Amino acid sequence: MMLKKWLRCSSCVLLVVFALAAHVYAGGGYFAMGYGPIAWQLAGAVTAVSEDAFAGASNPAKLSMAGNQLDLSLTLLNPNRKVERTGASGPASGYNFSSTSANSLFLVPEFAYSRQVNEQVAIGISAYANGGMNIEYGDSSGIPATNLNPALCGTKPGNFAGGCGKLGFDMGQFIVAPTLAWQFAPGQSLGISPLLTLQMFKAYGLQAFAPSSRSPRHVTNNGQDYAFGAGVRVGWFGEFKPCLSLGAAYSSKVYMQDFDKYKGLLAEGSFDIPANYSVGMAIKPRHGWLLAFDIQRIEFSGVRALSNGILPSLTNPVANPLGSKSGSGFGWQRDQTNYKLGVMYQATPQLTLRAGYTYGKRANDNDLNSVSFGVLAVNPIRAASVGMTWKTDSGSELHMGFARMDGAKYKGPSAIFPGAKESARPYAYAVNIAWSQAM
C-alpha cells in the first residue's frame, strides 16, 4: 500500500513540476548548479552533505540521514545571453549583427520529501529540472530577401542562423526521483532512485537547415513536442568519524523517446540525458564549520544530439543528414568535469551561513565544428553562491540563497558564413528561497 501511494505521488509531482518549471539555467553544461536550497547555497557540493531531503537529485544514499522532512524550493533565474557575428563579407555582410535573448526571467520550483520507515530504511521523493538551452533571438539582418531558404521564408530578412522570424530553442527536462535508502551498517548507507523523466523541446527560426535534413518538415517551427524517459541513480554515503563523511553517486544515461516533431533536427531524433557521476567529501575542521568538496563528471559525448559536430550535415548532407545518427549536433564533444567547493558555518543555533564555488571547462571547442550551434546554446562554466538558513521557533527552516553564473567569452569561426566570427558570453543571476519542515 505504501509503495502504491509512493508511486502515485511520483506521478502527481511530475505533472506539477512540468506545469510550473519550464527553464533551468546551467552550472555544468545544461545541468543545474545544484538541486534544493542547500545545494544552491553550496554550489552543488553536496554528494557527502546530508542537510535536506533532495538526496534523489544528488546521492540517494544520503536519505538515510534526512529523517522525516518536507522541502519546498523556488528559484528565480535571470539569464542573459547575447550573440554577435562580425567579419562576414560580400552578400553575407548583412549578417554582421548582434542579438540579445528575450528569455530573461524564469521561476523554477522544486520539491522533496523524506520518511524514515525504520532504523535501516528510508524512502522519499525529489522533483527537479534541467534546462538552460532556452533562447529567443528576435533580431534579423533587416534586409529583405536575405534568408537562406526562400522556399520557406519568401523575401523575409534573415535571422542570426539564416532562417526567418524569431530564432530560438526551448528545452526542459523534468525529473521525479522516488528514492530508497538502506543503512546496512552504522553510518553506512546505499541508495537507489529511478529517474522518471518528462522532456519538452521546441525550435524555431531554423529554416536554413531544412534542406540538409532527412526529414525537412520536422526541423523547425512545429510547436512544443514531448518525450518520456527513464534511468537510475545509485549512491553510497558513509560517516567515518564525527568530522568526516564521504559519498559517491552514479546516474545512468536517461533514455528518452524520440521527438516526432523534430526528428529531422536532433541527431537520432532524441535528446537523452547523459550519464554522470560524482564523488564528494565533507569535513568538520572545528565546531560549527563544514567544508565540502565534490568532483562531478558529465558524459556529454554519449549523447549524439549534443556531441556530434556541426559540420557533418553542412558539408555532406547526403551522407550525414540532420536527424540521422551522424547528423550535426551542438558540438559538445568533450565530457565535462566540474569541481565544487562549499563552506558552511553555524553562526548561532538559529542561523547557518553557506557559500560555494564551482568550475567546469566548457564541453565544446572554439572551432569550426562547434561554434555556430554552440553560440546558440552556450552556458556558464563557473558559479559562485552565498546563502543562509534561519531556524524558526516553531522548528521549520527558512532558506535564502543567491548565485551568479558566468563564463568566458565563447568565440570562433562561423560554419554558416565563411570568414565570419561568432561569439557569445552568457551570465545569469539566481535567487533561491525555500522552506523546510520536520514531519
Predicted regions and their residues:
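Bacterial N-terminal signal peptides that target proteins for export
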Residues: 2-12
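Bacterial N-terminal signal peptides
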Residues: 10-21
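Outer-membrane beta-barrel porins/channels
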Residues: 25-40, 105-439
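Short glycine/proline- and aromatic-enriched beta-strand/turn motifs that initiate or cap beta-hairpins
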Residues: 28-50, 73-84
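A generic hydrophobic-helix recognition signal that picks specific residues
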Residues: 45, 52, 222-224
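Outer-membrane beta-barrel translocator/receptor signature
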Residues: 50-58, 63-145
